[in-house]
Amino acid sequence: MTIVVGYVPTPEGEAALTAALAEARLREQPLHIVNSARGDSLIDSRFVQERGVEELRTRLDASGVVYEIDQKVRGHEASEEVVEAADRVNASLIVIGLRRRTPTGKLITGSQAQRILLDANCPVLAVKADT
């Protein structure tokens, strides 16, 4: 079994990664990091660039946890990528970061977190960033 984390380079993504690392250590399971972009713009701040991947690998190597970084740009929503990855690796847990949004913001853009919570076939741990 594997811990899957939806990661973006934001405070919420960092909180999710920290919690996922703790769970991976506790359960003695590998970590599968999902970072995706839809590919509909030249620059997507949610997609970790090469330098960021190197920094992420350094942090993960130091953790001692077995990990895999899964980056995709193929037009899917992040929630789809996370749920598909969790199914593919037979995840025991998905970890996601939450951010506060207005009710109008949720209505207009939908909620990736809500989609993961509803569509996941395993437990989901949702964490908030320190404020």
Task: Locate each region found by the language model.
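Conserved acidic residues
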Residues: 1, 92, 121
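Short secondary-structure boundary segments
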Residues: 35-36, 93, 97-99, 128-129
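Charged helix-capping and loop-helix junction motifs
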Residues: 48-52, 84, 108-113
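Structural beta-alpha unit
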Residues: 62-94
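Glycine-rich, Arg-bearing micro-motifs that act as flexible, cationic patches
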Residues: 96-119
